[in-house]
Amino acid sequence: MAMRLAAAAAFVRRLVPARNPVISAEAEAVTCGRGDKKTKRGKRFKGSYGNARPKREKKIERIKDRVEVPRSTPWPLPFKLI
């Protein structure tokens, strides 16, 4: 019985490729940091701009475009202000 288990284990080891744990851990570490171009930190690292890191002029435009609603306005907002 032990001989069969050893033979089966050897057979399974040949079928399943061995994984290198260092490579898989490295790939997971890059997904949300300096190497990820979709995050603000990644954009700063690469020196690029985009949705996560807009240029200064775009930021100022967005702030100016916001509608300031006075406190006396009833909630929900009237259709004209939306």
From Swiss-Prot:
The UniProt record lists the keyword tRNA-binding: no
One Gene Ontology term from the biological process aspect of the record: plastid translation
Superkingdom in the source lineage: Eukaryota
Keywords, comma-separated and alphabetical: Mitochondrion, Ribonucleoprotein, Ribosomal protein, Transit peptide
Organism of provenance: Oryza sativa subsp. japonica (Rice)
Segments of this protein annotated with the region Disordered: 34-56
Protein known as: Small ribosomal subunit protein bTHXm
Family, as annotated: Belongs to the bacterial ribosomal protein bTHX family.
Residue ranges, compositional bias (Basic residues): 37-46
Localization terms from the record: Mitochondrion
Signal peptide: none
Pfam families tied to this protein: RPS31
An example Gene Ontology CC term for this record: ribosome
Transit peptide, residue positions per record: 1-22
InterPro entries linked to this entry: Ribosomal_bTHX/bTHXc/bTHXm, Ribosomal_bTHXc/bTHXc_plant
Listed transmembrane segments: none
Claim: ATP-binding is one of the keywords in the record: no
